[in-house]
Amino acid sequence: MVKSKLGVLLVNLGTPDAPTVPAIKRYLKQFLSDRRVIDTPPILWWPLLRGIVLPFRSRRVAKLYQSIWMPEGSPLLVYSDRQQKALAARLPDASVELAMSYGSPSLGDAINRLITQGIIKLVILPLYPQYSATTCGSVWDAVSGILKKYRSLPSIYFIRDYAQHPSYINALKQSVARYFEKHGQPDKLLLSFHGIPQRYVRLGDDYPKRCEDTYRALSTALGLHNNKIMMTYQSRFGWEPWLTPYTDKTLKSLPAKGIKHIQVLCPGFSADCLETLEEIKEQNKEIFLKAGGKKFEYIPALNDSPEQIDLLEQLVSLG
């Protein structure tokens, strides 16, 4: 039975099914085989991936996932699932599905459920506020490939990103303001975005511009001057230069400059995950405190907050 003529597809990166070495190896193999993510020629990359990266990285990453795993499962999936359910409650006349680019729930299964319901319009919303070919571009590639097998296609609206959308900036502003009110204002607010290789930017990826757009808009909304707010890039991987300044190196240098109390927000993550809960909240906190910092606080992602669901609802309405 057809529930709706409108289908909404929320897409996030993905997560292992369990905090175990085999599950993480399966997940990393799929993720790191995406040519949008790693564009090294396969003849060079695949031996490294299978012979070095997967055997050694999977064991290390398993321990990290174990430290953040929630009773309900992986934080990214838990929060993304809550987002899907909350948005579906806001849009009773639409069919709302959640999919992950890598792992479960799969894009193919989610799209099939929507198509078989007879939808005539599909809104695709990658949950990445700032466009990058490595994220939003990869979603487009995967969705396009999946849709090839269907003879009848719905009208498709693809939301490229929402780096400056007023509701997104307002949601971040409200989150930070509440944190300031409860914990006090820090010496500096640091916005940490996921990095990408600098080479990808030279090839045309406008990701850093979109991060800067968010940074400027949020700085203005909060009324913070440059001496009170800054932006950095985290999660570098591999041997080539990534976007700078690096989050970890910046945090290590700040105490010597008199910055003793830092609060970190990761605006590029729509839901808390390994990169925020472990890399930032644990690893980078330790770096800052060991360098002489006195107080490190992490401001949670928007997750399934009312402001986040307001934002998702408004983004869907654009289609």
UniProtKB/Swiss-Prot annotation:
Q: What keywords would UniProt list here?
A: Cytoplasm, Heme biosynthesis, Iron, Lyase, Metal-binding, Porphyrin biosynthesis
> What broad class describes the main subcellular location of this protein?
cytoplasm
- Report whether Glycoprotein shows up as a keyword of the record: no
Q: Where in the cell is it found?
A: Cytoplasm
Q: Which InterPro entries match?
A: Ferrochelatase, Ferrochelatase_AS, Ferrochelatase_C, Ferrochelatase_N
Q: What class of enzyme is it?
A: lyase
One of this protein's Pfam families, by short name? Answer: Ferrochelatase
Q: Which GO terms describe its biological process?
A: heme biosynthetic process
Q: What is this protein called?
A: Ferrochelatase
Q: Which organism is it from?
A: Hamiltonella defensa subsp. Acyrthosiphon pisum (strain 5AT)
Which gene is annotated as encoding this protein in its UniProt record? hemH
